[in-house]
């Protein structure tokens, strides 16, 4: 990730806040008449640097937390006895659940860092995932996430559908495409997705594949076929750099994505790495000016 000098970062934040202040005086005249985006969830890709995860994402309305993996490289990120050795740093799911942004947990199951390796081990990862599920029955969970991602280039994706069919529900899986506007994306998905499995669609904005507006068109097409509750968009809160690495998206970049996803339930990838407290404050402030109340109020039940 690119390192930004503190002074430059302060200027960026000051500029963003100044623009919001200028807009705030007349925002009540141009508040969106459409439904605001419902920022429900936050992903976390566990690593040693961000364990345990901390943040203020509840200010955006986040109440569901998605640790991408419970187990990766056959080592567990949680301190529960689930039959795997543990990473040097790990967390307790019940303690995680006490955070306001993790009132609900969709538990990521067994995966691998390397996508090709994960795809080649789908059957074994499903078996490991069932073991995790069996060992976490006493923990209240919103559902499970099987962390083997699919795209149309995976010719053997049918085996993923078979693996998903063996796991308890509610269950989620994620999909993406390296094409800006993939043709027959819904047909491809329907060819292997089990009926009771839900889908996270990665918007592809962070990796530079498409614009937020293009992502919305794809999302609408998928939801027309599968239903709005079955397909949820994942907002990539990062941007690719010329060096091939990734940086955190600037607040105004995230805002552009959120505007494109009005009326939709949104999950963000990922909080601990890319959504720091200042970014959250700025986006939450914009949300309040744009829609007339805070994201937290809009999404509370």
Model regions and ranges:
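Bacterial N-terminal signal peptides that target proteins for export
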Residues: 4-13
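Compositionally biased regions
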Residues: 8, 19, 57-59
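Sec-dependent N-terminal signal peptides
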Residues: 13-20
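Hydrophobic core
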Residues: 21-25
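Glycan-processing catalytic domains of CAZymes
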Residues: 27-301
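Switch/coupling segment of Walker-type NTPase motor domains
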Residues: 1
């Amino acid at each position: 990730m690119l390192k930004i000098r503190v002074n430059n970062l302060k200027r960026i934040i000051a500029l963003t806040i100044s623009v919001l202040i200028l807009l705030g005086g007349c925002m009540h005249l141009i508040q969106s008449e459409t439904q605001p985006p419902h920022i429900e969830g936050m992903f976390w890709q566990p690593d040693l640097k961000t364990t345990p995860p901390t943040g203020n994402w509840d200010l955006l309305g986040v109440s569901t937390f998605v640790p991408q993996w419970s187990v990766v490289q056959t080592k567990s990120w949680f301190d529960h006895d689930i039959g795997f050795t543990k990473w040097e740093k790990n967390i307790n799911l019940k303690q995680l659940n006490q955070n306001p942004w993790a009132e609900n947990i969709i538990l990521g199951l067994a995966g691998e860092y390397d996508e090709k390796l994960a795809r080649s081990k789908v059957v074994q990862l499903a078996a490991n995932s069932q073991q995790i599920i069996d060992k976490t029955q006493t923990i209240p969970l919103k559902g499970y996430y099987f962390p083997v991602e699919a795209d149309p280039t995976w010719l053997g994706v049918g085996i993923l559908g078979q693996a998903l069919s063996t796991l308890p529900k509610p269950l989620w899986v994620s999909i993406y495409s390296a094409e800006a506007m993939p043709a027959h994306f819904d047909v491809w998905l329907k060819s292997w997705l089990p009926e009771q499995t839900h889908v996270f669609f990665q918007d592809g904005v962070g990796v530079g594949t498409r614009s937020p507006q293009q992502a919305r068109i794809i999302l609408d097409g998928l939801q027309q076929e599968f239903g709005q509750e079955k397909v949820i968009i994942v907002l990539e809160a990062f941007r690719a750099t010329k060096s091939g690495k990734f940086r955190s998206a600037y607040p105004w970049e995230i805002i552009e994505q959120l505007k494109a996803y009005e009326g939709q339930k949104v999950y963000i990838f990922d909080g601990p790495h890319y959504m720091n407290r200042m970014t959250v404050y700025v986006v939450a402030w914009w949300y309040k000016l744009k829609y007339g109340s805070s994201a937290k109020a809009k999404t509370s039940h």
